[in-house]
Amino acid sequence: MVLNEEQWIKELREKRIAYGISQGRLAVASGITREYLNKIESGKMKPSKELLETLHKELARFNPEAPLTMLFDYVKIRFPTLDIQHIIKDILKLNINYMLHEDYGHYSYTEHYSLGDIFIYTSADEEKGVLLELKGRGCRQFESYLLAQQRSWYDFLMDALVDGGVMKRIDLAINDHTGILDIPELAEKCRKREYIGKSRSYKFYQSGELIKHREDDREYMGRTLYLGSLKSDVYFCIYEKDYEQYVKLGTPLEEANIINRFEIRLRNERAYYAVRDLLTYYDAEQTAFSIINQYVRFVDEEPDKRKNDWKLNDRWAWFIGNNRQSLKLTTKPEPYTLERTLRWVQRQVAPTLKMLKKIDKGNGTDYMETIEQQAKLTEKHKMIIKQQTTPAKDLVES
């Protein structure tokens, strides 16, 4: 629903009061005087559309409901064993009888088991052992099984380490729900050298550029900023998540639940130390922002001072924790669905099926019935049917 200007101003005032924010504080954050804001709220002054959007955007930063959430977004662990059944049953605590087995793998592994987007690779090579890989969807699906097992990520990671698991990659994703970060602004600060970090390397890509060949969802990602070398064991990826939701799902940008995403990508020893820190303090915010603060900070230029003494940028200071609600590790359990298959059918197959149905109806033919009768289900299809029709509680080991 599109609000008119009067409704926007009424909503602005109501939210400001509900958040406990004074006119002066919001005015300063928005770059105007308190008197000017007072005239806007009382209807004596008509703001520009741009100013009204700025006021709403700045007010969103003061939302007492956590403006930031954090999730695991990628987990890759190698186990020094060839006993894949042990890893599935005792570490993942999943029922192997419901897993799809296929005689091929990635990363030079020769076979794998899968349950939705949860992949476990193995081979006859003892040095390679067993490899668990959970990408974004895999993490969300695994959380639904952790929930059924009454376990947490902390419990699982502890079990993995105790069993000798070697952390190969861990990604922590910080979701910005209110637009605290401004990616083009951060990119401009990198260009102007208002960016202090262990690595000066950065890359900024506009939406739609031929970019990010390593990214699975590269065609969906909006404007994207990489901080640090992509070859290093620590780097950051910041991108417009609302654009991704718009391209993937058609969600209007103004209705997107997540505006930006800040991903901390850790490999090998860096991933291990992050997990160790998580399991020592059980404080995901401390772990995440200690890594960020160690590697990067954005500042505002002060010509009369040394660069290391430049003032921390206000927006960046807010993001890393100044005067905002604390951040906790959250979960977003999602069941394994046929979303990608259904999207493919809808895009590639449905128009042809609809055409055949209309031809059958008009000519009295039975093309559709014949096609369905002749279709043969493979063992893979049968296992997917089994996975899709079994409740989560039956897919886990008790």
What are these model-predicted stretches?
Residues 15, 29, 40, 341, ...:
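Residues in the recognition helix of alpha-helical DNA-binding motifs
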Residues 2-7, 14, 18, 57-336, ...:
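Structured, helix-rich domain cores that form ligand/interaction pockets
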Residues 10, 14, 35-38:
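Positions in alpha-helical segments
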Residues 43-57:
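Short, basic-rich loop-to-helix N-cap that marks the start of a DNA-contacting helix
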Residues 20-38:
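Short alpha-helical DNA-recognition segment
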